[in-house]
Amino acid sequence: MCIRDRAVAIGTAHGVYAEKPVLNLDCLASIAGACSTPLVLHGGSGLSDDDFRACVAGGISKINIFTHNNLTAARAAHTHFTESVGAFELMPFITEAVKHETMHHMRVFGSDGKA
């Protein structure tokens, strides 16, 4: 069996938070120093751009932001919804909103231009 990546528990989890998560960057540094496996941050909800940058600098290789993108899509649908507009007509607005946020996160994570 091969472990390809490792999700670390440093103060985040999946979903929306009632309060801003508190990152344990010392824990991240310890794990990153002891492990050669790429590290994953589960649950980026509530983190600032600076928090994400600190995580990447500390050794995080993959960040999950589904909840953020899901809420972005829902907001775009809500903004453009009318009684005469269906899901098909909403998709361009949703796609553009999620694309915009994804490109922003790629710049923050330092992954833009690398695919």
Model-based region annotation:
Residues 1-3:
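Short, small-residue-biased leader/transition segments that mark boundaries at the very start
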Residues 44-58:
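Catalytic cores of alpha/beta
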